[in-house]
């Protein structure tokens, strides 16, 4: 059996990918551990980019669909030999989040055509309420990054339903909007995105706005 298959004994059916490496066996002890909750398009992409850029030494993927999390972790793990510094990526349970430095929450019901982010508010707040007590029990010292939509509402809701200090709860906010704006301006002006300094402020949604007076190229 290949060395990256390691069953998680606590919960039959979940298999860890690279678990022995994550525990530091045979290599130096790992430094940074990040847990991603939600193995959908956003969560799996985040895990992949962290692996490619070596943002973390250990990445845990958690999803209600255990097979999905396992499949995504395996795909990332099997491409690891191509990276300069392979990262240990594996699927696990909330218990496996213990010791995480950062927890990124991407879980939630995706928007349907014609639906606004705010239409999802109550549905995804309920999802968050199920996740919050489980993850904070095992990773009480982590910094939490909320990505699920509506991100502003869910970031506030996470603060209200947990004991995590506000300074350790971060919402992705308009970061993606700002990135899209800079990319579009760079394309339109035929310049490098690194030379575009413009921002999107406000809510990540219909009320977001661009303060053009401070935009620079």
Please state what every model-predicted region is.
Residues 39-40:
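Glycine-rich Rossmann-fold phosphate-binding loop(s) that bind the pyrophosphate
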């Amino acid at each position: 059996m290949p060395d990256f298959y390691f069953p998680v004994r606590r919960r039959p059916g979940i298999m860890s990918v690279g678990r022995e490496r994550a525990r530091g066996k045979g290599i130096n002890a790992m430094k940074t551990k990040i847990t991603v909750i939600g193995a959908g398009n956003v969560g799996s992409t985040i895990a992949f980019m962290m692996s490619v850029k070596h943002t973390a030494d250990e990445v845990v993927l958690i999803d209600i669909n255990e097979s999905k999390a396992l499949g995504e972790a395996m795909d990332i793990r099997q491409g690891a030999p191509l990276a300069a510094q392979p990262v240990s990526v594996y699927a696990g349970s909330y218990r496996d989040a213990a010791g995480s430095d950062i927890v990124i929450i991407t879980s939630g019901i995706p928007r349907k055509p014609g639906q606004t982010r705010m239409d999802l508010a109550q549905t995804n707040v309920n999802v968050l309420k199920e996740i919050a007590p489980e993850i904070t029990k095992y990773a009480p010292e982590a910094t939490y990054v909320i990505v699920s939509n509506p991100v502003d509402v869910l970031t506030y809701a996470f603060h209200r339903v947990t004991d995590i200090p506000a300074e350790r709860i971060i919402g992705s906010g308009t970061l993606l909007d700002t990135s899209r704006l800079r990319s579009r301006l760079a394309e339109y002006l035929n310049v490098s995105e690194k030379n575009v300094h413009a921002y999107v402020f406000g809510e990540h949604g219909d009320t977001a706005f661009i303060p053009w007076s401070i935009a620079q190229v």
